[in-house]
Amino acid sequence: FKKRAARRCKGKRENTMKTEKFKVTPLERAWILYDVGNSAFVLMIATLVPIFFNALAEAGGVSKVDYLAYWGYASSIVTVVTAILGPILGTLADTKGFKKPIFMLCLFVGVIGCCAMGLAGTWLAFLVIFIIAKIGYSGSLVFYDSMLGDVTTPERMDMVSSRGYAWGYIGSCVPFVVCLALVLGSSAVGLSQMTALSIALVITAVWWLVVTLPLLKKYRQINYVEVEQHAIRQSFVRIGQTLK
């Protein structure tokens, strides 16, 4: 019993030492930073963006019941489109030469959409831009997650991934605090609340893009499959077989 207890204590000490000594590489840090960027967008969407849409909808004569329904419809459209595009994007993420370019495309769609939401003059235009931006964000995550195998080793994946998750939560608060202070104190600086919300969206978009730059600079695709004929169609076939 004493020997088993000693081995367990030794194993715990070794695991603790490994955790304490764990340091991320520059490439791993660049990958983690993308979570810091896109999490700021998610936090903005969950908090301040509905206020912006609410104001636009009321200005457009839309009732409270209707604008809540429209917001739900927009979120549902994003979910359905993302689900349909998922197999296509997943196939492209595994194919040689596609991962980084399409990741950048999705990133720029999300970032530009985030900025453009603040420029929308009507609730309908806002919803259309919101849908496009959210699809861009969701698409980027497909490629971002698939990058982990190129960024680190299998033994380090869990640690790197968990740090991305944690840093994302913490880092997203930085621009959010600035944006929240701007919106709440908009009258003190001579801005309307709508103008402050528009600026907050731009701040979030800039944050998202800037913290992603290290990943765009450092990332190189290592693991891939060669381009195959009918690869996308085969992806849907495999999904159909799985569902059966």
Regions found by a protein language model. Name each.
Residues 18-29, 220-244:
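Juxtamembrane intracellular "pre-TM" segments in multi-pass secondary transporters
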Residues 21-79:
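Helix-loop boundary and gating motifs at the non-cytosolic
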Residues 93-107:
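Cytoplasmic membrane-interface "Motif A"-like loop-to-helix N-cap segments
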Residues 107-122:
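C-terminal ends and interior cores of transmembrane alpha-helices
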Residues 113, 124-140:
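Hydrophobic core of transmembrane alpha-helices in multi-pass small-molecule transporters
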Residues 135-166:
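Cytoplasmic helix-loop-helix junction between adjacent transmembrane helices
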Residues 161-183:
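Glycine-rich segments within core transmembrane alpha-helices of 12-TM secondary carriers
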Residues 175, 179-184, 205-224:
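C-terminal membrane-cytosol helix-exit motif in multi-pass small-molecule transporters
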